[in-house]
Swiss-Prot record:
This is 23S rRNA (uracil(1939)-C(5))-methyltransferase RlmD. GO terms for molecular function: 4 iron, 4 sulfur cluster binding; iron ion binding; RNA binding; rRNA (uridine-C5-)-methyltransferase activity. Keywords: 4Fe-4S, Iron, Iron-sulfur, Metal-binding, Methyltransferase, rRNA processing, S-adenosyl-L-methionine, Transferase. It catalyses: uridine(1939) in 23S rRNA + S-adenosyl-L-methionine = 5-methyluridine(1939) in 23S rRNA + S-adenosyl-L-homocysteine + H(+). It comes from the Bacteria. [4Fe-4S] cluster binds at C70, C76, C79, C158. It comes from Chromobacterium violaceum (strain ATCC 12472 / DSM 30191 / JCM 1249 / CCUG 213 / NBRC 12614 / NCIMB 9131 / NCTC 9757 / MK). InterPro entries: 23S_rRNA_MeTrfase_RlmD, MeTrfase_TrmA_AS, MeTrfase_TrmA_CS, NA-bd_OB-fold, SAM-dependent_MTases_sf, U5_MeTrfase_fam. Belongs to the class I-like SAM-binding methyltransferase superfamily. RNA M5U methyltransferase family. RlmD subfamily.
Length: 514
């Protein structure tokens, strides 16, 4: 389908890395466009107040524009910002964080931190690749999904995966095609550890002896004695995965030498995808937390102990809480593995359902580290009272909008000051923003009545903004309806004029004939 093309001047980037422009009162989100560029765009989704569009041509380039390294960029959904110069990516993400803090949380950090950034390429040590037999493509495809699509990108290489893993994409495509269950193996999970690599194949049917021989040969060919390539199968959910070859491989681990910590983990368990940046992130978080011997510190959403164990190395006593029982078990094992079992304790808890009473029951914490998923930790932070408030909170975030919301709760209702905040470029060439923020208790908590008044005011502001948007949309609809009515009236006038003229000419011709 051919879409109409128009010119726009791009003003900024949104949180997904799309160019933002305004044309005829509408907000445009334009894939592939950068701030200060003049582009020809083609709209592919239209709503009353906004449109989604694709860049067709760049008439005036931004100083931020770079040539994408990957030949699949623009089709593959694995990256969205390879067309942006690397240092500009970092600056854009920092601006996204600051804008969210100001707009959503109505807060400003006393200090903006220098961004944490590392290697631009080959950083991703965990990935979930899709696999599918596609007859039209002549075989099996292995890779990330295409942008905004369920189709798998036809990939031959990937510049964000480690080079030796990228080199496996084509051999994987060829090998899977030879399996008896090639059409029943929809996913390959990749895990790159300190001493080995693991491929977890999601097998929806049992493999045959011949399939096992093929997988074994693949491991032998592409692994090495000093760095094995271990094959795992996953017949159902993530907890069902198990190794099949080689069985004498070392454990899958990542390390943080600065804290003398080694973390064993399963390939399907959550860990940070960028181990270099993870180590720097942990170091920065602990610098702000400043754990001291004898302090009691909480690690909320602790996972397998990524922050818990480095904190415990300081001599502090750490209590980790996590909503997944398998991750809690792994965290306990990792504490023992590192000889820190006497310094840490863990429990499973739903941290999205914390109350003032349940938080108080945990006892007083001197400090707290929070590392929630994208939904944030608003319920946990609302449960803090004057009696239970930690003196310091370090918040590690994977979503700047929920961090901003939660920062608003801490600053405006719990008596905290946002001392510092900055971004962590955990995912180069994507719009994903990780960040860290340091809060210090400097004032009293608001009373419950005061909090209710603040929440009521915020709710009223949201409703007013919603009503304003609705009124704007209705006004736009009315304007368009008026335009259509005007066009229809003009068309009808032209039609009436045509027939009137025709009738006049017919009458003149009839008179002339007489």
């Amino acid at each position: 389908m051919t879409h109409p093309q128009t010119i726009a001047l791009v003003e900024s980037l949104d949180h997904e890395g799309r160019g933002v422009a305004h044309v005829d009162g509408k907000t445009l989100f334009i894939d592939g466009a950068l701030p200060y560029e003049k582009v020809i765009y083609s709209s592919y989704r239209k709503k009353p107040s906004y449109e989604n569009a694709q860049t067709s041509a760049v008439l005036k380039e931004s100083f931020m524009r770079a040539d994408p390294r990957c030949p699949h960029f623009g089709v593959c959904g694995g990256c969205s910002m390879q067309h942006v110069e690397f240092t500009a990516q970092v600056a854009i993400k920092q601006r996204v964080l600051e804008d969210n803090l100001k707009r959503i949380g109505k807060v400003k950090a006393e200090r903006v931190l220098t961004p944490i950034a590392g290697p631009a390429w080959h950083y991703r040590h965990r990935a979930r690749l899709s696999a599918r037999m596609v007859a039209k493509k002549g075989g099996v495809l292995v890779g990330f999904h295409e942008k905004s699509s369920s189709y798998i990108a036809e990939m031959r290489e990937c510049h964000i995966l480690p080079k030796h893993i990228s080199d496996l994409i084509m051999p994987l495509r060829e090998m899977i095609a030879t399996l008896s269950i090639s059409q029943r193996m929809p996913q390959v999970e990749v895990a790159v550890g300190d001493k080995l690599d693991i491929l977890v194949f999601r097998n929806m049917d049992d493999i045959t002896d011949a399939d096992f021989a093929i997988l074994k040969a693949f491991s032998d060919k592409h692994g090495a004695a000093e760095r094995p390539l271990q094959i795992w199968l996953q017949p159902k959910g993530p907890d069902t995965c198990y190794p099949i070859y080689p069985l004498d491989a070392p454990k899958l681990t990542y390390s943080m030498p600065e804290f003398a910590v080694e973390m064993p983990y399963y390939p399907t368990e959550f860990t940070q995808v960028n181990p270099q940046i993870n180590a720097v992130m942990v170091a920065r978080a602990l610098k702000f937390l400043d754990p001291q011997p004898g302090e009691r510190i909480a690690d909320m959403f602790c996972g397998i102990g990524n922050f818990t164990l480095p904190i415990a190395r300081s001599g502090a006593v750490v209590h980790g809480m996590e909503g997944s029982q398998p991750l809690v078990r792994r965290a306990v094992e990792n504490a023992t593995h590192n000889g820190l079992q006497d310094k840490v304790s863990y429990e499973m808890a739903n941290l999205f359902d914390v109350t003032e009473e349940s938080f108080a029951a945990l006892g007083k914490f001197d400090k707290m580290l929070v590392d929630p998923p994208r939904d944030g930790a608003v319920q946990l932070l609302k449960a803090i009272t004057e009696e239970t408030a930690p003196q310091r909170i370090v918040y590690v975030s994977c979503n700047p909008s929920t961090l901003a919301r939660d920062a608003g709760v801490l600053v405006h209702t719990k008596g905290y000051t946002l001392k510092a905040a900055g971004i962590i470029n955990m995912f180069p060439h994507t719009a994903h923003v990780e960040s860290v923020a340091w809060f210090e208790k400097t004032g009293p908590c608001k009373t419950r009545k005061e909090v209710e008044e603040i929440e009521a005011l915020e709710a009223a502001e949201r409703e007013a903004a919603k009503a304003a948007r609705l009124a704007e949309e209705n006004a736009e609809k009315a304007r368009k309806a008026a335009e259509l009515a005007e066009k229809a009236a003009a068309k009808e006038a032209r039609r009436a004029h045509y027939f009137a003229e025709k009738a006049r000419r017919d009458a003149e011709e009839a008179a002339s004939d007489q």
